[in-house]
């Protein structure tokens, strides 16, 4: 059995769908509502008249799911294989596909970090919502729904979901502005004008957050429920999440808490009592679409073949039970696989329901993410035998940083300084940042202290500590999230120090240097760590040509970069050599063996030229041609009832003028004499 068979499935499906969309057969087979959406999203003149459009990876993911669900009308993962590529079933784990969790319409979207999977999520939600609302009541197919559950893996992604559907927080306020949600901000991309009022009304009235309580807030016909994975935790796991803290011990001893904190108010007691009823409420819905963001958290594989379901998946199984084809699950992840084995036998086992694959290679070559650079400095290669783990005493307590770790941090700071000096000459608003990933929270204070010893101020370092599962306590999170989410806007902080917390949802653009002090061998953790810095920093069109030439220089010609514009530098860690070699072999990374000669070369050949002092005296403008003028000729029909009467001659006169019987006509030949 192949462990990557679903990638082959995704490739074959994509070819089928491309052909069907290009020849028009896909449009002919879908509902009128879906036709409206697909034309608005992917066809002219709409795509020519706006500045933002879906890129090819987003488009293909949307089309593939619509094709499977609406055209082929699959009801299980096995059915996807049977209808798209039946020969691949011989290489599948059929006992795996027979599990309850795959006996539903279930689709996994594999998209590289930073390539906009949230936009795909929005589009698919709109497709389901509008079809459900416009289906004839007596002819309902059961394949569309107005009920949605969107699940995040942690606090960062959950906050991003609230931004996307509830709107961003107002300045210095806990209130959200509904006119800043994604669908309103980008309505010209997502929603055809005829559907906008009903979509905006639905979003405003039917979004339910975990704080409001799923099943407690009264909504109209349908809901968009936002939550994170804690919804699916068992009571035992909830108790164990922070079991070593004093407050949790007190909660165990005194579940009804006296005092001044409001622990006994009715709302608080209701929340505790109703916690389990959220799953019951979702289970009782007649239909539902579940969207899992960062879905690699759902699976747990200790061998090639799952041993035990994680609580997240158990909860989904309960919700899906008895819904059959009225339950749809869409999983999004840049890394939809489990890692099995160890050492040379380590391999990736991809989820069996992957239906689209827009990988890092495609994203990088398309210029949708930064280009990776392995910072292989002379001092690092010469001292490869240094210890790169934190110093610990005989009781394994961390007592300091090793020489190798100090060396890596200095290399990262040096690169950050070079970028700061070069970028500010071109654009003072471009502020590069560095991220340090530590092995555990006992190391982060030593890293913070060392960075300050190297000259950084208190405000320049933001330390975020999390527990073993990568979670920050909610009260701590409230203190750091404002600084964290606005990090692109301000000069400080310059360096973010974390353990697991920032693996997902950290959607900032200015991370230009990553120092991976954490020596984990997990492929998923490595890819997720690298993914934190992939989002583009220099998005303006004037930099496109410079970036294209740089990608060619680094990825194809295997030479040093000419500039650092939209380059992500990873300070090389000896424990990750295999991972780095894989990146190099797949043409996903280049090597930077030293600093550019001086800061002026950081931005390559681009120079900043100011305006003339009297530029306002020049009345210049550049017309934007949206559509060339064309004469449209329409055939017209003559309505005899609307013709004016003919009065120039009488009826008798006309009879005299007309030819009489027996008249003959004589033809004359005309000659042209030539000199």
For each predicted feature, which ranges?
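Residue-level detector of conserved catalytic or cofactor/ligand-binding positions
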Residues: 656-669, 674
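Conserved pre-motif I regulatory segment
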Residues: 26-110, 119-120
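A short beta-strand element within the Helicase C-terminal
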Residues: 498, 502-519, 524-530
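Helicase-associated low-complexity regulatory tails and linkers flanking the ATPase motor
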Residues: 1-7, 11, 131-137, 159-163, ...
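Pre-Walker A (Motif I) flank of P-loop NTPase domains
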Residues: 97, 102-108, 146, 431-434, ...
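Conserved glycine(s) of the Walker
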Residues: 116
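The conserved Walker
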Residues: 113
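Conserved SF1/SF2 helicase motif Ia
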Residues: 122, 126-159
């Amino acid at each position: 059995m192949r462990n990557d068979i679903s990638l082959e499935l995704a490739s074959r499906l994509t070819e089928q769908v491309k052909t069907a969309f290009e020849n028009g057969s896909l449009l002919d087979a879908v509902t009128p509502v879906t036709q409206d959406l697909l034309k608005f999203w992917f066809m002219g003149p709409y795509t020519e008249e706006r500045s933002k459009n879906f890129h090819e990876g987003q488009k293909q993911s949307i089309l593939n799911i619509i094709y499977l669900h609406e055209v082929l009308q699959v009801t299980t993962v096995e059915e996807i294989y049977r209808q798209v590529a039946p020969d691949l079933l011989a290489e599948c784990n059929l006992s795996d596909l027979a599990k309850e969790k795959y006996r539903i319409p279930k689709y996994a979207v594999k998209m590289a970090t930073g390539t906009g999977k949230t936009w795909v999520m929005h589009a698919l939600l709109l497709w389901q919502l509008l079809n459900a609302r416009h289906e004839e009541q007596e002819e309902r197919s059961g394949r569309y729904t107005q009920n949605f559950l969107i699940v995040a893996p942690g606090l960062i992604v959950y906050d991003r979901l609230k931004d996307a559907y509830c709107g961003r927080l107002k300045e210095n306020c806990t209130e959200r502005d509904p006119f800043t949600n994604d669908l309103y901000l980008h309505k010209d991309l997502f929603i055809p004008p005829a559907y906008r009022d009903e979509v905006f009304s639905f979003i405003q009235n039917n979004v339910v957050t975990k704080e409001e309580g799923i099943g407690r807030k009264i909504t109209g016909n349908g809901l968009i429920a936002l939550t994170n994975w804690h919804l699916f935790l068992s009571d035992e796991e909830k108790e164990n999440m922070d079991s070593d803290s004093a407050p949790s011990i007190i909660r165990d001893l005194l579940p009804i808490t006296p005092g001044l904190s409001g622990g006994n108010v009715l709302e608080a007691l209701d929340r505790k009592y109703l916690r389990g009823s959220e799953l019951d409420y979702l289970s009782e819905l007649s239909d539902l679409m579940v969207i899992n963001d960062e879905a690699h958290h759902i699976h747990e594989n200790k061998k090639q073949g799952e041993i035990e379901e994680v609580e997240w998946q158990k909860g989904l199984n309960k919700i899906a039970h008895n819904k059959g084809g009225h339950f749809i699950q869409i999983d999004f992840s840049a890394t939809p696989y489990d890692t099995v084995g160890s050492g040379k036998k380590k391999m990736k086992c991809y989820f069996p329901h992957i239906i689209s694959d827009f990988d890092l290679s495609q994203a990088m070559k398309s210029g949708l993410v930064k280009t990776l650079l392995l910072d292989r400095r002379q001092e690092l290669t010469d001292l490869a035998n240094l210890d790169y783990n934190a110093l610990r005493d005989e009781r394994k307590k961390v007592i300091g940083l090793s020489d190798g770790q100090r060396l890596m941090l200095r290399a990262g700071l040096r690169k950050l300084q070079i970028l700061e000096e070069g970028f500010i000459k071109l654009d003072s608003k471009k502020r590069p940042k560095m991220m340090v990933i530590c092995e555990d929270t006992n190391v982060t204070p030593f890293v913070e202290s060392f960075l300050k010893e190297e000259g950084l101020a208190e405000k320049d370092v933001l330390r975020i500590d999390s527990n073993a599962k990568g979670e920050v306590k909610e009260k701590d999170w409230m203190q750091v999230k404002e600084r964290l989410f606005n990090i692109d806007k301000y000069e400080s902080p310059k360096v973010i120090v974390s353990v697991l917390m920032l693996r997902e949802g950290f959607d900032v653009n200015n991370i230009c240097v990553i120092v991976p002090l954490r020596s984990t061998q997990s492929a998923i953790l490595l890819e997720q760590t690298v993914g934190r810095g992939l989002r583009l920093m220099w998005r303006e069109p004037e930099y496109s040509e410079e970036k294209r030439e740089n990608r060619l220089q680094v990825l194809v010609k295997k030479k040093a970069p000419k500039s650092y514009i939209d380059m992500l530098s990873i300070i090389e860690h000896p424990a990750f050599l295999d991972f780095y070699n894989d990146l190099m072999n797949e043409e996903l990374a280049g090597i930077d063996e030293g600093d550019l000669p001086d800061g002026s070369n950081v931005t390559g050949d681009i120079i900043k030229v100011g305006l003339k002092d009297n530029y306002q005296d020049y009345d210049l403008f550049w017309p934007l041609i949206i559509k060339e003028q064309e004469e449209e000729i329409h055939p017209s029909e003559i309505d005899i009832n609307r013709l004016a009467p003919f009065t120039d001659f009488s009826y008798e006169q006309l009879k005299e003028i007309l030819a009489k019987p027996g008249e003959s006509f004589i033809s004359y030949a005309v000659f042209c004499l030539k000199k």
